[in-house]
């Protein structure tokens, strides 16, 4: 079971990683003239999103619901967050690769292709949704009914057995 002190530490780490992601999304274009620094920021951002994915799955594995074998229930409750996080991660990596390929050799010119602009907009929209749903999921996983046997869990278990 996730104790309160551990939960607050994990939640703080998740919010720190989300804050870094927001920071890089907000200010990375200002570093267009220095592609090496921009590349390092992008790599750390992708690793931060990957760490957030790992942390959320570790929180899933730690629940009583998961340990009782109701993985489908967890997946059903948090399906949107899981899918959105995967889409955001893929969009972020795609954007970072495309930006670095276009700007690496010629960082002094301002290069924005139509496809890059579309990808940029979709990645930023996905970032907003990712932050909202991820934070909501992280807070919802702090609910005690996920970590102990309850009438709600027994009802869900009986529905699965039918």
Curated annotation (Swiss-Prot):
Keywords: Cell projection, Ciliopathy, Cilium, Cilium biogenesis/degradation, Disease variant, Glycoprotein, Joubert syndrome, Membrane, Transmembrane, Transmembrane helix, Vacuole. The chain crosses the membrane at residues 7-27, 41-61, 80-100, 110-130. GO terms for cellular component: cilium; microtubule cytoskeleton; vacuolar membrane. It is a multi-pass membrane protein. Glycans are attached at residue 6. It is found in: Vacuole membrane; Cell projection, Cilium. GO terms for biological process: cilium assembly. It holds the Pfam family TMEM138. InterPro entries: TM_138. PANTHER family: TRANSMEMBRANE PROTEIN 138. It is linked to Joubert syndrome 16: An autosomal recessive disorder characterized by oculomotor apraxia, variable coloboma, and rare kidney involvement. Neuroradiologically, it is characterized by an abnormally large interpeduncular fossa, giving the appearance of a molar tooth on transaxial slices (molar tooth sign). Additional variable features include retinal dystrophy and polydactyly. Required for ciliogenesis. Belongs to the TMEM138 family. TMEM138 and TMEM216 genes are adjacent and are aligned in a head-to-tail configuration. They share some cis regulatory region and display coordinated expression. Genes were joined by chromosomal rearrangement at the amphiboan to reptile evolutionary transition around 340 million years ago. This is Transmembrane protein 138. It comes from Homo sapiens. The lineage of its organism: Eukaryota, Metazoa, Chordata, Craniata, Vertebrata.
């Amino acid at each position: 079971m996730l104790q309160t002190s551990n939960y607050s530490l994990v939640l703080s780490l998740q919010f720190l990683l989300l804050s870094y992601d927001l920071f890089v999304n907000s200010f990375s274009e200002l570093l267009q003239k220095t592609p090496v620094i921009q590349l390092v920021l992008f790599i750390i951002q992708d690793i931060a999103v990957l760490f957030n994915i790992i942390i959320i799955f570790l929180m899933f594995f730690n629940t009583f619901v998961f340990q009782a074998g109701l993985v489908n229930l967890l997946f059903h409750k948090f399906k949107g967050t899981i899918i959105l996080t995967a889409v955001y991660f893929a969009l972020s990596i795609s954007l970072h690769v495309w930006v670095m390929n276009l700007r690496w050799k010629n960082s002094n010119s301002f290069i924005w292709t139509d496809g890059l602009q579309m990808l940029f907009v979709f990645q930023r929209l996905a970032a907003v949704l990712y932050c909202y749903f991820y934070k909501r999921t992280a807070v919802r996983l702090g609910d005690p009914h996920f970590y102990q046997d309850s009438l709600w869990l027994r009802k869900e278990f009986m529905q699965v057995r039918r």
